Amino acid sequence: MSIIKKPDLTDPKLRAKLAKGMGHNYYGEPAWPNDLLYLFPVCILGTFACCIGLAVMAPTQMGEPADPFNTPLEILPEWYFFPTFNLLRVLPNKLLGVLAMAAVPAGLITVPFIENVNKFQNPFRRPIASLVFITGFIFAVWFGIGACLPIDKAVSLGYW
């Protein structure tokens, strides 16, 4: 009637993992009916309620009429392109900007190989991956905010 993952606690490899703090501490929680009958419908109904609520409370409004002869002073991309837009805008050489953007996925690909010696699944026990994530997040937010400012304040955000 239910699908339960029961560990074999007589397995010495599993016991050694659990003794080191690796693995899960919640073995035996059934996926049926806990997740499929209770959690998923709540998430689906909550998402549906948010969509309906936003459609009723804040309907989309018409913007300014398009004028092909009047362009804005500075054209900004969508918000999710702000960090890369600011990086291309701030770096003096465009090839350097493209190489800097290509270095991001290349750096992310190297993280699992650097931390290959660490077998823990806990992010607090993976200091390199956590440091790369936190540094990248701060960099993206910093450059995203800087994209909305003039180019002379784009890196410093006007602080220095």
From Swiss-Prot:
One of its GO terms (cellular component) is chloroplast thylakoid membrane. The keyword DNA-binding does not apply. GO terms for biological process: photosynthetic electron transport chain. It comes from the Eukaryota. SUPFAM superfamilies: a domain/subunit of cytochrome bc1 complex (Ubiquinol-cytochrome c reductase). One of its GO terms (molecular function) is oxidoreductase activity. Keywords: Chloroplast, Electron transport, Membrane, Photosynthesis, Plastid, Thylakoid, Transmembrane, Transmembrane helix, Transport. The chain crosses the membrane at residues 36-56, 95-115, 131-151. It is a multi-pass membrane protein. The keyword Transmembrane helix applies. It is found in: Plastid, Chloroplast thylakoid membrane. InterPro entries: Cyt_b/b6_C, Cyt_b/b6_C_sf, Cyt_b6/f_cplx_suIV, Cytochrome_b_C_euk/bac. Belongs to the cytochrome b family. PetD subfamily. Component of the cytochrome b6-f complex, which mediates electron transfer between photosystem II (PSII) and photosystem I (PSI), cyclic electron flow around PSI, and state transitions. The 4 large subunits of the cytochrome b6-f complex are cytochrome b6, subunit IV (17 kDa polypeptide, petD), cytochrome f and the Rieske protein, while the 4 small subunits are petG, petL, petM and petN. The complex functions as a dimer. This is Cytochrome b6-f complex subunit 4. It comes from Thalassiosira pseudonana (Marine diatom). The gene is petD.
